Amino acid sequence: MIEVLLVTICLAAFPYQGSSIILESGNVNDYEVIYPRKVTALPKGAVQPKYEDAMQYELKVNGEPVVLHLEKNKGLFSKDYSETHYSPDGRKITTNPPVEDHCYYHGRIENDADSTASISACNGLKGHFKLQGETYLIEPLKLSDSEAHAVFKFENVEKEDEAPKMCGVTQNWESYEPIKKASQSNLTPEHQRYIELFLVVDHGMFMKYNGNSDKIRRRIHQMVNIMKEAYRYLYIDIALTGVEIWSNKDMINVQPAAPQTLDSFGEWRKTDLLNRKSHDNAQLLTSTDFNGPTIGLAYVGSMCDPKRSTAVIEDHSETDLLVAVTMAHELGHNLGIRHDTGSCSCGGYSCIMAPVISHDIAKYFSDCSYIQCWDFIMKDNPQCILNKQLRTDTVSTPVSGNELLEAGEECDCGTPGNPCCDAATCKLRPGAQCAEGLCCDQCRFMKEGTVCRRARGDDMDDYCNGISAGCPRNPFHA
C-alpha cells in the first residue's frame, strides 16, 4: 500500500511579498511566500523513501484552502533510459543512471475536474498547477530560510521578449483531405500509443547553463513531465528513453536557419543515433536564436521515419513550461497534427497547436488536434509507437480509490460496485468509455455541446466536447 505524505503549506506574510523578484522562471512581479511543513503519515520507525509514490499538499491560494493530489510519474523513463555526454578529447561516454526513485509528479486539485499539475520535488517544489482556470507556478526561494517557496500566477511573470514567437511550419493545410470526425469518436484506452522520446542538447545550450549537466538534466526531465501530461488527452504516452549532451562540440552544423538545422539533425539521427540507440522520435534543444520569430520546426506526419521523426526546438524561455509546450507542439506535427484555426477549441486559454505563442499559456490540445492525430495514426499506422516499453521495475501495486490513475490503470477502481470500472483490474468494463468526470454519464462520454460547468457572473458556460470525460474550459472565457 502506498503511504500518503501529507504536507501542510501555510501562507506567510513576508515583508517584500508582492514586490518584484528574480526567480528561475523569470522576473516575477507579484508572488506569495509559503513554507511547506512536512507531516508524514508513516508509522514511527518506518523507512521513508526519498520520494514517495503518492503525496498530498494542503495549501491556501488567494486565501482559499485547496488540496493538491500528486502521484509519481512512474512511466516517465523507458526501461533502457541512458545519458550520453562527451569528454574534452571527444570520447563518447554513455551511462544508464538509476531513475527508479525519481522526483517528478503529476496530479490534480481536489474538487476541480479541470485541474492539472506537474511538479518536481527534486530540490524543493518546482512546477505548476492549474486551479479554476488559472495557472500557478511554484518554486523554492533561494534564501537563508531554505523552506521558503514562491507561488505566483503565470501572468505575473514578466515577458522576456514582446516579439511574437511561432512555429516554423508553414505547410498548406488545405491540400489535405477533410477529416471525418465521426470515425474518431469512440476511441478508448485500448487504442493508446507509446512514444519513446530521445532528447539532444547542443553545445550552445550546454554553455548557456554554464556546463551544469545536472541543471540541464533536471530541466529536461521536468519538461518531459509536462509533455507527458499534455499527451494523455490524445491517448498517447511518452517515455524519455535517452538524453545526449553535446558537451564538447556540436555533432552537426547548428545554424539560425531552422530548416537547414532540422535537415542536418535528421540525417545525424538516421546515420548515427539510431544505430546505437532505439527510439521513436528525437528532438534537438538548442540555444541558437532561429531566424525571424521561429522557435521550433518539425516534419509533418513523419512519426517513425528514420530521418523525419525529428524536430528542433529553441530554448527560448527561462520558464520550462513554455519550452515544454513548444516541444509538445512540434511533436504534434510529427503525429500529423496541423496548426489550429478559429474553428478549433480546447480547454486552455490558448491551444497547444496554435501557430503563435499566446501570452495565455497553452495547456491542452484542441478537438481538431485530437481528430487529426488519430486520423494520421489510423491511416498511416506508424508501427514504432505500438509497443509499450516502460520501466517494469518502477511500477508499484495500484491503489484503488486514490482518485489518481496509476501505472496500468484505465480508471480508478474505487469499489466493486462501480458500473464503469472493474475493481479487480482497474480497467474499463466492456462498452464503457469512461468511469468519472463531468462529461461522463453512465460510463459514456456526454454529447458534444452538453453544459458541464455553468458560468459565473458574466463568464461563459463550459461544454463537453463529446470525445473525453473531462470538462474543457471554454476558450472564450473572459
UniProtKB/Swiss-Prot annotation:
Q: Where is the active site?
A: 330
Residue ranges the record marks as coiled coil: none
Q: Which GO terms describe its biological process?
A: apoptotic process; chemotaxis
Stated name of the protein: Zinc metalloproteinase/disintegrin
Q: Which family does it belong to?
A: Belongs to the venom metalloproteinase (M12B) family. P-II subfamily. P-IIa sub-subfamily.
Q: Which residues form the Disintegrin domain?
A: 397-478
Q: What GO terms are given for molecular function?
A: toxin activity
Q: Which residues form the propeptide?
A: 21-187, 390-405
> One short Pfam family name for this protein?
Disintegrin
Additional record remark? The disintegrin belongs to the medium disintegrin subfamily.
Broad EC category: hydrolase
Protein residues bound to Zn(2+): 329, 333, 339
- Keyword Calcium attributed: yes
Origin organism of this chain? Bothrops jararaca (Jararaca)
Against SMART domains, the record matches this protein to: DISIN
Which InterPro entries does this entry report, sorted A to Z? Answer: Disintegrin_CS (IPR018358), Disintegrin_dom (IPR001762), Disintegrin_dom_sf (IPR036436)
Q: How does activity depend on pH?
A: Optimum pH is 7.4 (strongest interaction with alpha-5/beta-1 (ITGAV/ITGB1)).
